[in-house]
Amino acid sequence: MTEKEGTFRFKQFRVRQSRCAMKVGTDGVLLGALAIVENQESRVASQESNRPIVKCLDLGTGTGLIALMIAQRNPEALITAIDIDAGAAGQAAENFALSPWADRLTAVCGDVRESGDDGKFDLIVCNPPFYEHSPAASSVARDTARRTDTLTHEQLVECASRLLVNDGRLEVIIPYATTDEFVHLGWLRGLHLVRRIDIRTKAAKPYKRSVLSLVKIEELKNGRIEHTHSFLTLLNPDSTPTDEYRELTRDFYLDK
């Protein structure tokens, strides 16, 4: 159940959003559901065992939705959620306190570009600003939340490379048209693509979003890195959710 200026209800938690410029949306739900939050086989030459996902950072958290979804999916995760907007950080803190995982969620108001937590996080998730140099949004807060003038993709990958542990992972959802450029920016910073999922609303529509998984690797174990590439369609021709989308979100949406 959703109210634009009120509360969005999920199966295990609620998201209040009246003080956030950017409301709960499909992009955030997709990243929260698709992000790899479980332990994965190490790709680092000096590391033999799997790296556990424990310390996580939700960059530009907004309402805290993605952090809450990660907390639900991974019972071991300790999640820090940062936002440059005080209203959003305060709203996220409120949502965390009302959730079943309040002891594992921390909201911080700050600029990630000034963070001193170098090499701290196993996982960084981000639903970043999605347009550059576009006409101003309807409010200063919304403009700050949406414009890549505030945090560019280049700055995002630089921050992720600095803040991740070796073998740590960056999970993002970005516009499909910017995917190749983003992957290249990541590669320049030692973040290597391991998974790509292209997403469209309907089969007759063009792809609009991509969810990318990039791993920080300072020394490769077996040389070249291969990545998987898959596709997701959200709606059937009659606008009902596809079986794949229903399955993906069944643990979250009340009506799935």
Where are these regions (language model features)?
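Short, basic, low-complexity termini and linkers enriched in Ser/Thr/Gly/Pro
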Residues: V37-K55, I217, N222
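Residue-level signal for inorganic ion chemistry
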Residues: L31, N127, L156, L214
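Mobile active-site "lid"/loop adjacent to the S-adenosyl-L-methionine
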Residues: P128-Q155, C159-R162
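SAM-dependent Rossmann-like transferase core, predominantly class I methyltransferases
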Residues: E3-N39, I53, L59-M69, H227, ...
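SAM/dcSAM-binding transferase cores
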Residues: P206-K256
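Conserved Class I SAM-dependent methyltransferase catalytic core
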Residues: C20, V24, T150-Y207
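Conserved SAM/SAH cofactor-binding pocket of Class I
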Residues: A33-N39, P52-G119, L123-C126, E132-A137
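General small-molecule cofactor/ligand-binding pocket signal
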Residues: R16, T80, T106-V108, V194-I197
